[in-house]
Amino acid sequence: MAKDIEAAAAAEGGEYMAKDYSDPPPAPLIDAEELTKWSLYRAVIAEFVATLLFLYITVATVIGYKHQSDPGANAADAACSGVGILGIAWAFGGMIFILVYCTAGVSGGHINPAVTFGLFLARKVSLVRAVLYIVAQSLGAICGVGLVKGFQSAFYVRYGGGANELSDGYSKGTGLAAEIIGTFVLVYTVFSATDPKRNARDSHVPVLAPLPIGFAVFMVHLATIPITGTGINPARSLGAAVIYNQHKAWHDHWIFWVGPLIGAAIAAAYHQYVLRASAAKLGSSSSFRG
């Protein structure tokens, strides 16, 4: 069993908890001073570059798979159909693992507006940082997909540009539910992997936080690629839609923003008010008093 040294004792006016870890104080809603710090802009640049690389590798994988599995364009390879859905899922999950590992110490390794939104609701990041991250992630995604189109212009439009769309036979409600549940799994994993209590126990193995996050992305892709192509990342969906810019990319685009944001909000509430309720009560509750 995991080591958990928590001794509850009675004290005047309530209880206190002695523990082997400390919860960071809640981030301020608006921190104007943060705008004067280079560390913020360094983190924003890291989010931009990470999201650019994420979209470039993953969308290029999708386009390559569709080209290899197209019997009309590549009959020799059509029988083996390239990497397949499993390979696409590995590309998305593997890149998240790599990029979270590389950027966690600089920006926190969000690489996803839904993750940023969930952490903002949990008061892990300020509003200023959240807005700048989401802008950087969106621009990075657009640039990343733009590189794919530039390098593979012959195949990009022919194979759908890697854009998310609702598959035939599925209702909008089903697509929305798939995005909500998929994003919940991802953001729930992010909260669990970065929990201060877990970090205190596993800090000697720094790879442990990025690994489950990458696996969560991998597993969600296996489940939802047949339904929506798997969004769970509004920046990923926006970047592909902007560069592809066809009707089908925009027709149900709202699903890939509304679903992930709802899923992230539910995950934040579940983690903060159910799983970590005792820590919230015994922690910095005074910060919410006027």
UniProtKB/Swiss-Prot annotation:
Principal place of residence: membrane
Gene name tied to this protein: PIP2-3
Matching SUPFAM superfamilies: Aquaporin-like
Motif residue range(s): NPA 2: 233-235
UniProt cross-references to InterPro entries, sorted A to Z: Aquaporin-like (IPR023271), Aquaporin_transptr (IPR034294), MIP (IPR000425), MIP_CS (IPR022357)
GO molecular function, one term: water channel activity
Entry text on domains: Aquaporins contain two tandem repeats each containing three membrane-spanning domains and a pore-forming loop with the signature motif Asn-Pro-Ala (NPA).
Official protein name in the record: Probable aquaporin PIP2-3
UniProt short sequence motif NPA 1, positions renumbered to this chain: 112-114
Annotated source species: Oryza sativa subsp. japonica
Subcellular location: Cell membrane
Family, similarity comment: Belongs to the MIP/aquaporin (TC 1.A.8) family. PIP (TC 1.A.8.11) subfamily.
